[in-house]
Each structure stands twice: as C-alpha cells, then as structure tokens.
Amino acid sequence: MIPFCFVVCASWAIWHIPAYILTLAPHANPSTLAQVTAIHESKDVTPGLPGLFGGVADVVDWLALALIPIFLVIGMFSVRVAQMEFQHWRSVDRVALFIGRVTMMLIISMTCVMLYEVFLRYALEAPTLWANELTLWIGGFVFLCSGFYGMQQRSHIRIFLLYDAVSRPLQRTFDVLWTTLFVLFAFFLVFGSYRQVFVIKFYNWEMFGTAFDPPIPATIQPAVLIIIVLVAIQAVLNVISDWNLEPEIHTAADDIDGDEIEAIKRTVGDG
C-alpha cells in the first residue's frame, strides 16, 4: 500500500512540476515563461484551485510534494525482504529495497495501461492517444529504477571466471577497482551533462512533441543522472557491506532454480 501511495504522490508531483517551477523559480525570459505557463495551464489536473505562496502550485500540488518524503521514510522502515531476495542486506539498503517495491508497482501500472489500450483498440475499436506514450514513459522509469534495485541485489551480469580463481584479498581489490571505475563514470556523466539535462531539458520542461505530449525528455533525462548517482552510491555500499564475507564460488548449479524444476515435475506428473 505504501509503494502505491508513493507512486500516486510522485506521479502527481512530476506531472505538475511546471507549477513548482513557476512558483519557486519563474523564468526570466518572457518567451520561456509564457511557454512553461501554457504547458502548465494545458496539463493542470485541478485548474480551478487557487495557487498558494503567491504562485500557481495549488494545495493538492504541495500536499503531494510533502507526502513523497513521508511515504518514502515509512516505506523504507516497513519494507520486508522476500526469501528470493539478497539476504545479507543492511539498513543502508532500505532505500534500494523500497525503490524495488515502487518499481514493481510501476510494472503493474504499465501492464494495466497496456491491457486497457488493447481492450479499447480491439474490443471497442476506440484506441487512445496516450496509452502507448504513457507506457514508454513508465517503462523508462522502470528500466532506471530496476537498475538501482538490481545493484543492491547484486543481480547485474558478472563474469566470475577470473574472480573465482583468485584469493579473497585480490577479490576485494577487483571489487574496489570496478567500483572506482563506475564512480568515475557516474561523476563524469553527471559533470558533463547536468546543465544540458537540468537547465535545457528540465527547467524549460521539454515535452515529447506528440498528441499526448508527455514530458519524457524533461523527466527521464534528469532521472538518468539521479539514478546513476544512486547506483554509484549503492555500489560503494555493496563493497563495504561485502568486505568481510567469505569467498563465494560460482558454478553452473547456481543458475538452476530448484523450485521451478519441482513445479515442472508436478505439472508433468499431473498431465
């Protein structure tokens, strides 16, 4: 329930970011100001509500924004690790674990949108203008957030041929080396593109340019930089958390899912 509430509040706040921009940091350029104002007026879900604090963001916008960190904290401290997940987790992993639950909610939301579009298109012959682009938009966040969650779960693809053949101290050296390279990559990516992303794309609220016209460039590109920073931080936390673990030898048997095999046996037996 908490991940669902977080997704609802975050979705509302993201959709109404132009209201926050116009309230907190309006553009000095009259042309850009008029453009963002027009976007806000055309996309505002509650146009009848007056703005607060001398701006255009209304009470619902501010309430959604205020509830995001509240649901984040509640979700972090109420998350429970499933049996199939990485068991050697620590308190610092709670953010990634909760984002994993949020990602699952986004997948459900994306599936519902696709099913709704299929029903309208083929049953009623009345397709929507927004379902495909909304699916692309949600899918972008799913891809990014799952990368953050996957880093915490140690589920990214790794080649263990050399790693398993060396001693534990040398394994730690490899861990530090690849983590350092990844942190450097994240740093230079953010350093080299933050102005292009946060000023040109986000602050000017660049839209997708279609009939539905979602703000995919204005939201996905900043999310890329934010998530890459979180993934880099999580990579460092993983090295620290796994420092004293015993060496783990990986074999082909690790890829075998015993529960799945038993389920197949039961299915064949029932047939």
Q: What would you call each of these model-derived segments?
A:
Residues M1-G271:
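Alpha-helical transmembrane segments and membrane-interface helix-loop junctions
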